[in-house]
Curated annotation (Swiss-Prot):
SUPFAM superfamilies: FMT C-terminal domain-like. This is Putative 3-methyladenine DNA glycosylase. Its EC number is 3.2.2.-. The gene is mag. It is an enzyme of class 3 (hydrolase). Keywords: DNA damage, DNA repair, Hydrolase. Pfam families: Pur_DNA_glyco (PF02245). One of its GO terms (biological process) is base-excision repair. Coiled coil: none annotated. Belongs to the DNA glycosylase MPG family. GO terms for molecular function: alkylbase DNA N-glycosylase activity; DNA binding. InterPro entries: Formyl_transferase-like_C_sf (IPR011034), MPG (IPR003180), MPG_sf (IPR036995). CDD domains: AAG (cd00540).
């Protein structure tokens, strides 16, 4: 069943697990995501309102919000909710299921399969995300989101690497999947 991206991010996020996002010759099965809510979520890029940088997050659901993280990594979110609400789902980790040689060339030779798209920056690099992909629809022509084949077990916990709204259980992942990023002190199981 297709995902309704006009729903709130915390509803869409677990539905994305097991789906495949394809772009730039690479398909990645999504294994870990984080929901970022509207302007009430202090950890969201939209917390202080609309800016030129985060404008895509205020667009219609089902579009990409691509930004540069730590000055070098391109990270991607799928915008959710009605237009103007500023919600999205951060793509944290996944398994490369097609175009592995392309993903490997983007990430560097010798990166183990499970780590090719492990972490938001690596996910973006393996997928070939560019700032020019900001606002692009996940329904084509340059992106394609495929429904999941089966519904995986899903675990919910706190988001990683944020300092605000840390108690919110808005990180979702497939337990025991080797591609889940985790971080010291955060569960992967």
């Amino acid at each position: 069943m297709p995902i309704d991206f006009l729903q709130p991010a915390d509803i869409v996020a677990p539905q994305l697990l097991g789906c495949t996002l394809t772009h730039g010759g690479v398909g990645i099965r999504i294994t870990e995501v984080e929901a970022y809510l509207d302007s009430t979520d202090e950890a969201a890029h939209t917390y202080r309102g609309k800016t030129p940088r985060n404008a895509a997050m205020f667009g219609p659901g089902g579009h990409m919000y691509v930004y540069i993280s730590y000055g070098i990594h391109r990270a991607g979110n799928i915008v959710c909710g009605p237009e103007g609400t500023g919600q999205g789902v951060l793509l944290r980790a996944g398994e490369v299921v097609s175009g592995e040689s392309i993903a490997q060339s983007r990430r560097g030779e010798g990166i183990p399969h499970a780590r090719l798209a492990q972490g938001p920056g690596n996910f973006g690099q393996a997928l070939g995300l560019e700032i020019s992909d900001n606002h692009a629809s996940v329904f084509g022509p340059s992106f394609l989101i495929s429904d999941r084949v089966e519904t995986p077990e899903i675990v919910r916990g706190p988001r990683i690497g944020i300092s605000k709204n840390t108690e919110a259980l808005l990180r979702f992942w497939i337990p025991n999947d080797p591609t889940v990023s985790g971080r010291r002190g955060y569960p992967k199981e």
